[in-house]
Amino acid sequence: MALPMMIDCDPGHDDAIAMVLALASPELEVKAVTASAGNQTPEKTLRNVLRMLTLLNRPDIPVAGGAWKPLMRDLIIADNVHGESGLDGPSLPEPTFAPQNCTAVELMARVLRESQEPVTLVATGPQTNVALLLASHPELHAKIARIVIMGGAMGLGNWQPAAEFNIFVDPQAAEMVFQSGIPVVMAGLDVTHKAQILPADIERFRQIGNPVSTIVAELLDFFMAYHKDEKWGFDGAPLHDPCTIAWLLKPEIFTTIERWVGVETEGKYTQGMTVVDYYHLTGNRPNTTLMLDVDREAFVDLLAQRLAFYA
């Protein structure tokens, strides 16, 4: 039986590719997609969800837009990474269907209520919508099997020296998620920086030759440009968000550990830092499964295999 799940995302090139991977996988049943503000402004990320689902011919999946800003601060966006539209590069179709007449939290709550079994929630952007869901519907916590997030890191940042972008955008929301008591699986920079897509991989995807694989290659062409800056020291581009979906499909290609994680919400230099109790110094019980490593070749093979689904 397919795993019931929802995706909360802020497309974003890697969010879009995570959607492509999920919807090419019969092991997963995507019951809803909600949009968060992050990589771009909320109206743009919502439009990008609709554009991607139009490309993938999935107007049957309900969509809703979420919070317009983080819980306690102004919105920060990553237009320097993802461009003016949030999905710059390829020519994507205009949406052929409309979002639901409800908020992201209302849609997620409806899916949880109606599901006969617990639902996995994948969140590849800031955690604002997820935190609002948890705060407003404590009666539904038991219906959430796990929350799989892309965000954070054990020891480095990509937006601030100590903070990864998704967590830095809304650290208060992320802290609520980690301390919710619901199992969290974290794909942080420790693993996503090892899930790099190289130029040869992009050409492999392009050669698959269907409309979706071509769009994915063009998304990666644009995404690659930002990551060529020498400061990163990358050979390619880290494909952050698809690690969440890949873990659901093939957990055996990832190396993980169980640890307690908290989020620094106020630090002068460390606001947005995910604090990982690696040596069990706090006495807190582990609340998070952290991905630390990935078989890069197996990860790329999985993407290529699932892109062929769209032939």
UniProtKB/Swiss-Prot annotation:
Q: Which Pfam families does the annotation name?
A: IU_nuc_hydro
Name the enzyme's class: hydrolase
Could you cite one Gene Ontology molecular function of this protein?
purine nucleosidase activity
Q: Supply the InterPro entries for this chain.
A: I/U_nuclsd_hydro_CS, Inosine/uridine_hydrolase_dom, IUNH, Pyrim_hydro_RihA, Ribo_hydro-like
EC number(s) per entry: 3.2.-.-
List UniProt keywords, sorted A-Z.
Glycosidase, Hydrolase
Catalytic positions are: H240
Q: Name one GO cellular component term.
A: cytosol
Q: Which CDD domains match?
A: nuc_hydro_IU_UC_XIUA
Q: Does the keyword Protease apply?
A: no
- What is any one GO biological process for this UniProt entry? nucleobase-containing small molecule interconversion
Protein's UniProt keywords contain Hydrolase: yes
- Give the source's domain of life in one word: Bacteria
Q: Which family does it belong to?
A: Belongs to the IUNH family. RihA subfamily.
Record function comment: Hydrolyzes cytidine or uridine to ribose and cytosine or uracil, respectively.
Tell me what this protein is called: Pyrimidine-specific ribonucleoside hydrolase RihA
